[in-house]
């Protein structure tokens, strides 16, 4: 009798231990495998060797830098794993390391949004993304565990109304990256791209008299662009500088941008002889015009035009630098030089008089 009792007790203990082990195994399988994910974010033209970037490629002011940054990490099933908003004390070109605790052994999509508070977007049919049209309200409402609205974000556009409208304040920047997180802690260097085309005009008056700029236009500019890069492919050129080699543009009407400035509206912008005048930067939208881009300047009321045959496309983050020289002698015709940075620091048509 005593022996039977001991046998029963040992059997019960064995079953209990076995059950606990199975329970522990199941619990271990259900627990996600977590690792540290460190992300560093830089402007696309800063994330290259600095010796290869000209001064025109560097950010000119705080509007061209990161004033706020949002990082959203999305798992393979489309679930939001993290949504973090960062507001540094000063505008940055390179963000400090941001660490996330995430599930390992899987690919993830990382969405980066910069300067969202100054960005107004809408859907393709013109519907505002939020009550006030502000992107920040929409992004803030995306919670961890929610299904990420990739389709909605891919359809958002920025629009400029009016022939003199341009992007102002902190420029919109963004990007999405696919990363593969392994079984150990890992880090990635990511970049964001400015969703704008920048024009810089420098006018050098080498004539013997003071002149006045009374007008400036840029032909074939797009009224709308995708907020996020759309169908965009990047490649490093021979100088190691990242450039956009393929992208989609919003099918939209093109128009002639008319530069509006209080000085031009009144008496024009003074062009003193022997001096170089640089106009405030102009920020417009990317496009894919089937016709050549062109610009015109009116000096003392006389218009002069220049086509850009070597500038077939204007992807985002392009910086077009237009140098204009008014020669000392001649029939009054100006000479033009056009450079594009940071993607291509070589003059499209080297030298003046082209």
Regions found by a protein language model. Give the residues of each.
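Short, low-hydrophobicity acidic/polar segments
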Residues: 34-38, 42-199, 204
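Bacterial N-terminal signal peptides that target proteins for export
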Residues: 1-9
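Tryptophan-paired
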Residues: 58-131, 200-202, 207-316, 350-354
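Bacterial lipoprotein signal-peptidase II cleavage site
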Residues: 21-27
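C-terminal motif of bacterial Sec signal peptides marking the signal peptidase cleavage site
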Residues: 16-19
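Acidic, serine/threonine- and proline-rich intrinsically disordered appendage/tail regions
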Residues: 314-354
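Compositionally biased, non-globular sequence tracts
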Residues: 30-32
